Amino acid sequence: MNIFDHYRQRYEAAKDEEFTLQEFLTTCRQDRSAYANAAERLLMAIGEPVMVDTAQEPRLSRLFSNRVIARYPAFEEFYGMEDAIEQIVSYLKHAAQGLEEKKQILYLLGPVGGGKSSLAERLKSLMQLVPIYVLSANGERSPVNDHPFCLFNPQEDAQILEKEYGIPRRYLGTIMSPWAAKRLHEFGGDITKFRVVKVWPSILQQIAIAKTEPGDENNQDISALVGKVDIRKLEHYAQNDPDAYGYSGALCRANQGIMEFVEMFKAPIKVLHPLLTATQEGNYNGTEGISALPFNGIILAHSNESEWVTFRNNKNNEAFLDRVYIVKVPYCLRISEEIKIYEKLLNHSELTHAPCAPGTLETLSRFSILSRLKEPENSSIYSKMRVYDGESLKDTDPKAKSYQEYRDYAGVDEGMNGLSTRFAFKILSRVFNFDHVEVAANPVHLFYVLEQQIEREQFPQEQAERYLEFLKGYLIPKYAEFIGKEIQTAYLESYSEYGQNIFDRYVTYADFWIQDQEYRDPDTGQLFDRESLNAELEKIEKPAGISNPKDFRNEIVNFVLRARANNSGRNPNWTSYEKLRTVIEKKMFSNTEELLPVISFNAKTSTDEQKKHDDFVDRMMEKGYTRKQVRLLCEWYLRVRKSF
C-alpha cells in the first residue's frame, strides 16, 4: 500500500457515522463504550498493563520492595514515572466507577521540565482512540457534544432503558444543552427526529478535546471556558436564543472528553469559577441568559509548585482545594531511566547518529540526579544516588542505607527541585557541538560545558558550590577511574582470560592456605608451602590495600564454594564478586608506566610500538569512541590520573 492509499484509508476510517436513535440504543445493548464516560474511554485507550513481579529481578526488588507493579505500554516512553502514571490510572478507574474522583480536577503538580505537559499530551492523544456518540439534528451536530442520553429523564425513563437495553441507571442524568432543548421543542417532543453521530475525538478539530491557557487579568474572562454570544448571529436570532450563542469555550468543546488547563493557577480566579460547578454538578452557566450547559468530561490541569503553593495558601480558594486530585510529577531520580530520557530526546533529533562516547550520558544523568536529591543523614549522597538506581552497596559501602530508609528521610517533596531535563538536554546540545569539526559528545567536553554553565546561570553561591562539588569531588574522579579502566582493558588483549587466571589462582592459593596444606602447581611442578602461598596471595592483595587478609580469603573461598555448587563444580566468572574483581583489577593495572608508550600519541620509536598503538586505538574505537576522542581522552587521562 502506497502513502496515498494509506492516507485515504485512514481518512475514511475516521469519518463520522450516523445512526437513528433506535439504532444507537440497540448498539448500547452490545457495546458499553457507546455510553461510557470519558474516564472509562480513556482507560480503554490506555489498555491493560503488563504486570511485573519485581521479586524476580534483584534491582527492581530493591526499588519496589518485591511488589507486583503495573507497566502500561501506552506510557512506555515515560521513564521513571511509574508512581505518577499509577496515580493517574487510579484516578481514572475511580472516576470510571462513578466515585468522587469523577467530580474532581486531575491536577499534575511538578517542577519545570518534569514531564507534566508530555503526560497531558499523551492523555489527549489517547482520548482520540475511542469514539463518542453525539446528538445531531437537521444535519447539524450538537456544538457541545450532547450525548443522546441527555434526552431521557432519570426518574421517568431509567427503568425502561435498563430493562430493554441493559443501560445502568447511573449513566443517565446529564442535562440537555440549550441547543438540544430548542431542537426538541421544534420537533414537538418527537425524539426519533434526532440523529446520533459516531464521532472520533480530535485534538486538531477540537472535538471533545480542548486546551486553554491563562491570560492576564485585563484581557481574559470566563468566555475562554464557557463561550459567549456570537455577534454575527444577532442579526438573525435574539440575544438569549441558543443559536445566537458561540459555543467556543473550552468546556463546551471538551464535553465527553478532556479539557487541558495549562498553568491553571496563573489564571485570574474569576476565570476558574465555572470549573466548580462543571466538576461537581456536571453543568455550568454561559455568559448570557441561556440555560445551563452540560459537562461530562475530565478537567486536566497542571502547573509548577510555586503557583500551587501561592494558590493553596489563599484561604479564599478552599472551595477549589477540595475539588483537586493532585498527582505529583517529580523529576526522574534513577540514573538508568534518566539516560533513557536523553536517548529518547536524541533519537528525535539529528544527533541520533552522532557519536557519543561511553559514559557521557551516564555522567550527565548522575549530575542531574545529584542536583535533585536531598542530602541524606550519616551517609554519602553518591551512595544514595546509586541505591536509588537499584544498586546493592552492602559490599562496598557499609554506611549505605536501604532505598526505603533514604526515601522516608527525604520526605514526599524529593525530586521537586533541582536541574530539569530541559537544562540537561541544552547542555548535551552544546557538548555535541563543542568541537567545530566533529559533531560528537564525550565526558571531558561535558565537564567543561557544565562548569561554564554553572557560572553563567548565576545560581545562588551555595547552590553553585554544591554543583561544582558534585563535578570535581565525584564525577570527574569517577570518570578518571572509568576511562582508566577503558584504556587499560583495551591495552590488555586477553583481559578477560588474564583476569580469570588471576581469580582461579587466587582462589586455589587461598583454599590451600586456609587448610594449611602445601600446594603443587600441576603445570610447573613447583611446590608452595604456607609461607610461599601467603607471599603469592599478598602480591594480589597489596595493590588493593586489603587490611585483613585472613577474613578476606575466607570470605572469597566460601563465596566460590557456594557458587561452584550452582555452576557444575566450575569457578564463577572473575567479575562475579565485586570485592575480588576490584582487587584483581588493581593488581592488573598497578603498573601503568608500561601503558604509556602504547596509549600516548607521540611519535613511535619502533614498528612494534606503532602496531601496538594502532591495535589499542582500534580496540577503543570498537568500544564506541571516535579516533579523535581516543586521543583527547587518553591525553586527559595521562594529565589528571595522578591527581586522584
Question: Locations of the language-model features?
Answer:
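Long, basic/Gly/Ser/Thr-rich N-terminal segments
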Residues: 1-40
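Conserved ASCE/P-loop NTPase catalytic core
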Residues: 32-644
